[in-house]
Amino acid sequence: MIAALLLAAAAASAVDAERAFARDAQKIGMWSAFRKYADRDAVMFTPQAVWARDFLRDRKDPPKSISWRPAQSYVSCDARTAINTGPWFTPDGKLAGYFTTVWQRSGGSWHWVYDGGGPNKVAPAAGPPKVYRASCARRAPGAPIIPPPPLTKSQARTTPEDNGRGEAADGTLGWDWKVGKKGDRHFRVYQWNGSRYTLVLNNLVPAP
């Protein structure tokens, strides 16, 4: 266990962290792996937004885990925030859809803060993930994302709002999400290219 924790801490990139996460899902159990890599304030969807710490707290691992692999990774200039996406598969290896995970590095370790996904009929070709790094040219003013209304203390303790946002510390990568009343979800990622922000990921997840 100590060796596994040291390996997670030593992950050089969010792609490495994603791969370690996926390996651990097979080794120690799916929900155990989710708990291991989750940030304290990580968010999941069921389909409404829930705190991962509450959803995962007493959840037992299934007999067999799903599997997944990163296909694209969008990284901030300072390489401390990244958003990975790629296909995920049922325990018997059938394509089930795509995942999107937001990762942040703190204290030498990577933890995920957002985990979502949606249906997909075609998986990207297997191979090394494509990594897209934000520009480090010029100071990024902050991604063009509308912040959600502030939560009351009671709301913050119980459940996430139906929308949220986040941004890399250097401002070169930002994301936001919103859940509809029926459980549909919209997730966007903006990346700084040196002169402006471009929309690099736009997930429209239908209601279940």
Could you say what each language-model-derived stretch is?
Residues Q48, L56-A96, L151-K181, L201-P208:
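Surface-exposed, charged secondary-structure patches
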Residues F21, W68-P70, T81-T85, Y98-W103, ...:
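Short, structured motif recognition centered on aromatic/hydrophobic residues
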Residues R19-D24, D41-F45, F89:
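Second-shell loop/turn segments in exported
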Residues M30-A33, F45-T46, R69-S73, V113-Y114:
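Surface-exposed patches in mature extracellular/periplasmic domains of secreted proteins
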Residues K27-Q48, A52-F55:
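Short, well-ordered alpha-helical segments enriched in acidic and aromatic residues
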Residues I2-W31, R35-K36, K121-T159, R165-A169:
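Short, low-complexity N-terminal intrinsically disordered segments enriched in polar/charged residues
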Residues A96-P129, R185, Y190-A207:
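Short beta-strand edge/turn micro-motifs at domain boundaries
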